[in-house]
């Protein structure tokens, strides 16, 4: 027998006098120990009735344990005799490579990845091995097949008495047997392993010290089965890889699909060359720790320092306080557990104390091959016991009982004299190794708790592991990326917090008021919280959907979408492992609170009585635990030295939870929102300095979480984002899960992806690949940085083909959109690795692929992030970028109409979901209220609210788009219909029409105009067969337009053909609208003003709406001082580069642009007046407006531009450069007289607005010059659009028109409502406009001097715009 059994025997013999029954305990099977543990498990439970267990020193056992710890062996016979072996024998592992699971994989990755290639309509038939019994109870232990090498950094764990399932308390001693005032009745649950099963090595692999020693780790392997009564979790097993259709699969944290095939095995080679092991795959006794960081050395290569155990100071009688022993140099911190506050469960080794009894298991102590609480098999449960949300710090000592009024009994505080050497030297040694904080005081306790509700933790910051804290030595999840001694730089983990799903099946403890801890609670005497039966009881999986409904109303569980692309953050970093110093009360308890009173809400006075009367969940008495109680008693008198959040024991493990601190600052309580960790007390703050707060806020809404709820039920309940809200597999949710499985299988089979309407969309919508992180609820990108010049690669790309050499417009959709997503931060989840540039090969004409390309790409149904890229990547003409997500490699060649028809999904459905963002309902808080412009600003804001596109109108347009799209796709799936214009650029008004760009295959041998007329005629015939539209008018201009009206809502629709520049400039306006809140009110007010004065109609040779928007943006860039808007072309030249021939480009119409930090604080009224002033004095004869350069350009330069569509005859009166094709967007303003009258309206409006400061002076009360419309004549439309003079509008049909008069060629009539003298002044104008005030103008507002308007009060407008 092992020394552990000898220790148990000694302890049992010492307790025999006081007990009526003794229990023979043999070693239990530990699933994380040697793989030879193969035999069945016999669990026996006996009741030991004791009145008191005397304290007996077991000092004769301490040298044996220490000797075994240093021996490097865990063989039972050697442990029995105390034979030590050299330390060299434990260095038997491969450093960076995790061996594959025993037995290998039954199915290769190629097979798993290729399952969906031809499985449409074929049921899945992947056999489940005998080691997996889904949703059933396994009665036998799994067969272990293969040994796996040990890790190099595994220390040798000292033995412990049999029956001790967990290592001793921090500060515990091997030579003490402690138990005092134990509960009258305790239950001992033991397991016996068959001889030769390898179970002997398990108990010896667990440290028996108070602070876990650097013991030899158990051999790593993946357990192949489940223990009795354990929840069935499907993992990678020794015999094969199984389909992960169970959402109780929270342990592979970087695997892409929520259902489906895992993307990579457990032991895989990371691109960085480091091994990645996730916590929970390997259940192993954690290694010893090297207190001194070794810079530049990975933890698997770092030597393990063997140090003696911590000797603890005995508690004084039954008092509730203890003194802090002086620190000694002989007791350095040693840890054999990576649990944050000790091994969880009914009793931890660190906190091994008698516990109040409850036959049911806590929700984190469920018996599985991880946990096996009752039978002591797996070094303790994988999850900790329930904890209280408000725990921010922990006293050095385990809570036994807390008395009310100063009278209480101490359950277990006894210790022996040899254990008084250095009670808290572990704490002090750990604290002295940190620069943050030493021993904390009670005030620090209170302060760190209060920090949970808002402020940052000024004392220290910490991070925790995501899924589990049973970390392996080589687990990159245990990286301490905050350690100052670290020499490696690690990017934050790129996936959000993942909740433990089964947690919802357990009720939360009642929120109790936190009280200041006034007593010292020994850390070693851990007693788990005793809850009521209804509170502790675990709900059955098939109990029904209402089993947990009452406990899940306060929050939502976070979604579990994790992709292998997030693996980029998993790299090794030199630094310490988790060292949990003494000072942590049991998980779920607040300092100074009784576990009973904390769990049941009982007053502290009743805590001791309740604890004494309750029956223990498992063996925690000294007689039952043997040396375990001795270990626990070693730290009984640990002082009130609360370990800092940044001490050795609380170093950051993972940046999965760094969102929480920032979210606390944003008003989201991390303990109550979805960011609370279910692996640690909810109150603990995390560091968020490395994550994008806005992105996290977008991807993790927690609006339903009550900020005052101390129990943080948010993580118990499903979230809206999660695709299975009935997550606990009740009878109702099983059907939902099965339906989701079917959808996922169909998605794999059809080469598409189930529609997720919460993500953004593209215009065109053929490729949504790079938006996958948004579809997966991860932080969105705002596309600021590129890793290669966009236009340079496209120059080479287009030089290989004729000007119209694209075989299909689908080829332009092939381009991976991520090369147009320019990262603001390299650490963003979907950041492109440097070197992963996209190289476009020469596209060859492949007639046989035209239909496939068009079907896959032209159809907006391919709006998923996979449906287009994978089939196009299979073609030989494009090299797709590398992606970590291997599911994109599936051979997806199925026609996407199948997927569209299956779901009935169109791109308009995505835009329908953003209808709530269309309207601005409230003025921003920054709007000034105390200056002279306040009435005018409010009038401008009111005008904007009245004229902006409402949510109702927006939805009408989206549904109309969907109807047109559906009609077209049923007959011509190669067509692409994309909504452009002000309807989706946030500049739309109530009366705005709809502009649709139709994309289709082009033939280079056919004239583009004739081809456009043909396709528009086809569309007219298709739509004419329905009864939805009327008044069709096909305008065969140079840019043909099909115009018609909706019968129901009378919405005017314009469809153009292959006008790709409309897609780009729509996206540009959409981006500008997000940079400053004043842009949209200014633009809409100017548009309303222009429409009121009849100068906003390109058909009438006036300014189009798009040109007006460019004028507003140009003014905000140049005319306002300081500028309100930047020049996006200068900031992001690759993103907004010139449009290349036949290059439609990719834009994200849901792109999030950060607001521009402008120093301009002018109000809306001030900006409107400045706008009118700026364009009243603008020198239109010399300069052209250009938002591309952020200034003005000489007209000669614009005429000389070599753009393919540029025409020197277009640059006449009003010159506004199109930022993408360098044409003149205001080419409709070619008549000199008309333009002069337009300028007069600018001048007159400015003078009236400046004199009255009333917006109605330029609207309802305006009586100056204007342009009146005559009824349309019967002249031919061809004469209008195909005029003989070269200055006639060549692309008139493509201009955006808000006019209610669809008929062409109206007559122009100028009317002077005041006097005719103004026209004489205009005709005889000098270099700068000189205006004679009319009779109704206020004489005090006349311009003086030479008549120039330069002398006006507004000094914010530049006299001359800058020349680019």
Curated annotation (Swiss-Prot):
Kindly list the places in or outside the cell where this protein is found, as annotated in its UniProt entry: Cytoplasm; Nucleus
Q: Where is this region: Disordered?
A: 27-97, 159-203, 315-338, 417-535, 666-732
Q: What are the record's GO terms for cellular component? A: cytoplasm; neuron projection; nucleoplasm
Query: Where does the record place Polar residues bias?
Result: 427-444, 509-535
Q: Which CDD domains match?
A: NT_PAP_TUTase
Q: Which Pfam families match?
A: MTPAP-like_central, PAP_assoc
Q: Which domain of life is it from?
A: Eukaryota
Q: Which residues form the PAP-associated domain?
A: 1163-1224
The record, for Gene3D superfamilies, names: 1.10.1410.10, Beta Polymerase, domain 2
The residue ranges flagged as biased composition, category Basic residues, are: 445-455, 494-504
Q: Which cofactor does it need?
A: Mg(2+); Mn(2+)
Biological process (GO) annotations held by this record are:
long-term memory; mRNA 3'-end processing; RNA 3'-end processing
Compositionally biased spans, kind Basic and acidic residues: 66-91
Q: Which reaction does it catalyse?
A: RNA(n) + ATP = RNA(n)-3'-adenine ribonucleotide + diphosphate
What UniProt keywords apply to this chain's record, in alphabetical order?
ATP-binding, Cytoplasm, Magnesium, Manganese, Metal-binding, mRNA processing, Nucleotide-binding, Nucleus, RNA-binding, Transferase
What spans are recorded as compositionally biased (Low complexity)?
A: 27-51, 175-198, 417-426, 461-493
Positions that bind Mg(2+): 993, 995
- Any one GO molecular function term: poly(A) RNA polymerase activity
Q: In what tissue types does this protein appear?
A: Expressed in the brain.
- EC number(s) given by UniProt: 2.7.7.19
The signal peptide, as residue positions, is: none
Would the keyword Protease turn up in this protein's UniProt record? no
State the family it belongs to. Answer: Belongs to the DNA polymerase type-B-like family. GLD2 subfamily.
Q: How does it assemble?
A: Interacts with Fmr1 and eIF-4E.
Summarize the protein's role. Cytoplasmic poly(A) RNA polymerase that adds successive AMP monomers to the 3'-end of specific RNAs, forming a poly(A) tail. In contrast to the canonical nuclear poly(A) RNA polymerase, it only adds poly(A) to selected cytoplasmic mRNAs. Required for formation of long term memory.
Task: Tell me what this protein is called.
Answer: Poly(A) RNA polymerase gld-2 homolog A
Which gene is this protein's source? Gld2
């Amino acid at each position: 027998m092992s020394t552990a059994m000898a220790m148990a025997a000694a302890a049992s013999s010492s307790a025999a006098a006081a007990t009526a029954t003794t229990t023979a305990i043999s070693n239990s099977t530990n699933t994380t120990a040697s793989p030879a543990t193969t035999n069945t498990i016999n669990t026996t439970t006996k009741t030991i009735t004791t009145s008191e267990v005397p304290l007996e020193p077991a000092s004769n056992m301490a040298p044996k344990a220490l000797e075994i710890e240093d021996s490097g062996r865990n063989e039972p016979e050697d442990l029995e005799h105390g034979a030590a072996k050299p330390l060299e024998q434990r260095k038997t592992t491969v450093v960076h490579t995790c061996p594959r699971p025993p037995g290998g994989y039954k199915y290769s990755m190629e097979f798993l990845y290729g399952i969906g290639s031809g499985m449409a309509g074929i049921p899945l038939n992947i056999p489940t091995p005998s080691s997996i019994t889904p949703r059933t109870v396994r009665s036998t232990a799994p067969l272990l097949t293969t040994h796996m090498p040990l890790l190099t950094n595994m220390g040798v764990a000292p033995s412990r008495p049999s029956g001790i399932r967990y290592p001793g308390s921090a500060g515990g001693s091997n030579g003490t047997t402690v138990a005092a005032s134990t509960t009258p009745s305790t239950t001992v649950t033991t397991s016996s392993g068959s001889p030769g099963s390898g179970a002997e090595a398990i108990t010896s692999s667990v440290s028996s010290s108070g602070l876990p020693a650097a013991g030899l780790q158990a051999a790593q392997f993946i357990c192949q089965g489940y223990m009795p009564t354990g929840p069935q979790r499907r993992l990678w097993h020794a015999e094969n890889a199984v389909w992960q259709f169970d959402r109780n699969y929270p342990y592979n944290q970087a695997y892409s699909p929520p259902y489906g095939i895992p993307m990579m095995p457990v032991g895989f080679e990371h691109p960085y060359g480091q091994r990645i092991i996730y916590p929970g795959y390997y259940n192993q006794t954690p290694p010893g720790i090297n207190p001194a960081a070794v810079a530049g050395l990975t933890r698997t290569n770092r030597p393990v320092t063997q140090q003696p155990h911590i000797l603890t100071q005995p508690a004084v009688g039954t008092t509730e306080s203890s003194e802090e022993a002086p620190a000694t140099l002989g007791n350095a911190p040693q840890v054999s557990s990576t649990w944050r506050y000790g091994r969880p469960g009914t009793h931890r080794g660190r906190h091994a104390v008698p516990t109040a009894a409850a036959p049911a298991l806590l929700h984190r102590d469920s018996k599985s091959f991880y946990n096996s609480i009752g039978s002591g098999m797996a070094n303790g449960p994988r999850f900790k016991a329930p904890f209280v949300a408000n725990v921010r710090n922990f006293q050095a000592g385990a809570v036994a009982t807390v008395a009310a009024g100063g009278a209480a009994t101490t359950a277990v505080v006894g210790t022996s004299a040899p254990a008084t050497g250095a009670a808290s030297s572990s704490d002090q040694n750990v604290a002295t190794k940190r620069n943050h904080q030493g021993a904390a005081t009670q005030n620090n306790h209170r302060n760190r708790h209060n920090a949970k509700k808002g402020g940052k933790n000024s004392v220290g910051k910490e991070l925790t592991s995501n899924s589990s804290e049973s970390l392996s030595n080589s687990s990159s999840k245990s990286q301490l990326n905050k350690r100052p001694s670290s020499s490696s730089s690690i990017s934050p983990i790129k996936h959000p917090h993942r909740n433990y799903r089964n947690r919802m099946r357990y009720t939360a403890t009642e929120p109790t008021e936190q009280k200041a801890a006034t007593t010292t609670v020994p850390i070693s005497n851990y007693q788990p919280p005793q809850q009521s039966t209804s509170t502790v009881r675990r709900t059955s999986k098939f109990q029904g959907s209402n089993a947990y409904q009452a406990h899940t109303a306060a929050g939502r569980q976070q979604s579990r979408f994790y992709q292998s692309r997030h693996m980029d953050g998993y790299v090794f970093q030199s630094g310490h492992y988790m060292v949990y110093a003494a000072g942590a009360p049991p998980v779920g308890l607040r300092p100074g609170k009784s576990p009973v009173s904390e769990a049941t809400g009982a007053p502290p006075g009743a805590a001791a009585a309740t604890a004494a009367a309750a029956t223990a969940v498992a063996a925690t008495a000294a007689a039952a635990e043997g040396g375990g109680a001795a270990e626990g008693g070693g730290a009984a008198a640990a002082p009130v030295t609360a370990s800092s959040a940044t001490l050795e024991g609380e170093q950051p493990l993972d940046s999965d939870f760094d969102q929480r601190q920032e979210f606390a600052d944003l008003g989201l309580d991390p303990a109550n929102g979805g960011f609370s960790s279910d692996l640690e007390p909810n109150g603990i703050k995390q560091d968020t300095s490395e994550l994008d707060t806005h992105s996290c806020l977008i991807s993790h809404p927690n609006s339903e979480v009550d900020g005052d709820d101390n129990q943080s039920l948010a993580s118990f309940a499903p979230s809206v984002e999660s695709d299975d809200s009935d997550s606990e597999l009740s009878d109702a949710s099983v059907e939902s899960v099965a339906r989701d499985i079917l959808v996922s299988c169909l998605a794999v089979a059809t080469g598409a992806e189930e529609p997720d309407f919460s993500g953004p969309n593209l215009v065109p919508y053929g490729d949504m690949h790079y938006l996958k992180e948004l579809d997966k609820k991860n932080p969105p990108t705002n596309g600021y940085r590129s890793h290669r010049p966009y236009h340079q690669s496209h120059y080479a790309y287009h030089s290989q083909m004729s000007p119209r050499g694209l075989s299909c417009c689908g080829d332009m959709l092939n381009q991976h959109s991520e090369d147009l997503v320019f990262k603001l931060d390299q650490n963003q989840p979907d950041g492109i690795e440097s070197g992963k540039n996209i190289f476009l090969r020469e596209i060859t004409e492949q007639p046989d692929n035209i239909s496939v390309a068009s079907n896959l790409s032209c159809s907006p149904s391919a709006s998923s992030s996979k449906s287009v890229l994978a089939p196009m990547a299979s073609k030989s003409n494009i090299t797709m970028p590398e992606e970590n997500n291997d599911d994109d490699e599936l051979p997806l060649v199925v026609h996407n109409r199948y997927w569209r028809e299956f779901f009935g999904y169109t791109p308009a459905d995505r835009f329908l979901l953003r209808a709530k963002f269309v309207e601005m309902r409230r003025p921003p808080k920054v709007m000034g209220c105390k200056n002279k412009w306040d009435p005018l600003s409010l009038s401008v804001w009111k005008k904007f609210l009245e004229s902006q596109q409402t949510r109702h109108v927006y939805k009408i347009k989206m549904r109309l788009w969907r109807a047109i799209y559906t009609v077209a796709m049923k007959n011509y799936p190669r067509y692409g219909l994309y909504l452009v214009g002000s309807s989706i650029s946030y500049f739309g008004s109530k009366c705005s029409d709809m502009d649709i760009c139709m994309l289709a295959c082009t033939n280079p041998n056919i004239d583009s105009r004739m081809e456009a007329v043909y396709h528009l005629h086809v569309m007219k015939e298709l739509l004419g067969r329905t009864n939805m539209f009327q008044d069709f008018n096909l305008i065969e201009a140079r840019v043909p337009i099909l115009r018609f009206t909706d019968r129901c809502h009378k919405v005017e629709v314009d469809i153009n053909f292959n006008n790709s520049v409309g897609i780009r400039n729509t996206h540009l306006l959409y981006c500008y609208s997000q940079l400053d809140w004043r842009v949209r009110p200014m633009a809409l007010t100017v548009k309303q003003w222009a429409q009121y004065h009849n100068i906003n109609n390109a058909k009438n040779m006036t300014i189009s709406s798009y040109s007006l928007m460019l004028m507003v943006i140009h003014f905000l860039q140049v005319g306002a001082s300081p500028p309100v808007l930047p020049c996006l072309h200068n900031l992001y030249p690759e993103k907004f580069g010139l449009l290349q021939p036949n290059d439609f480009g990719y834009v994200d119409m849901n792109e999030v642009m950060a607001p521009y930090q402008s120093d301009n604080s002018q109000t809306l009224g001030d900006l409107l007046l400045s706008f009118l002033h700026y364009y009243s004095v603008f020198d239109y004869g010399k300069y052209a407006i250009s938002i591309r350069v952020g200034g003005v350009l000489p007209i000669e330069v614009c005429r000389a531009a070599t753009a393919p569509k540029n025409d020197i005859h277009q640059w006449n009166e009003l010159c506004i450069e199109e930022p993408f094709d360098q044409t003149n967007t205001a080419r409709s303003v070619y008549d000199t007289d008309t333009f002069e009258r337009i300028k007069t309206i600018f001048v007159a409006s400015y003078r009236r607005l400046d004199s009255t400061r009333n917006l109605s002076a330029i609207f309802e009360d305006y009586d100056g010059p204007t342009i009146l419309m005559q009824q349309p004549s019967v002249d031919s439309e061809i004469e209008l659009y195909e005029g003989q003079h070269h200055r006639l509008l060549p692309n008139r049909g493509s201009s955006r028109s808000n006019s209610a008069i669809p008929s062409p060629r109206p007559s122009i009539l100028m009317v002077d409502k005041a006097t005719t003298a103004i026209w004489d002044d205009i005709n005889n104008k000098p270099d700068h406009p000189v205006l004679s005030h009319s009779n109704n103008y206020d004489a005090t507002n006349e311009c003086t001097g030479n008549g120039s308007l330069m002398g006006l009060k507004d000094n914010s407008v530049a006299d001359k715009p800058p020349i680019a």
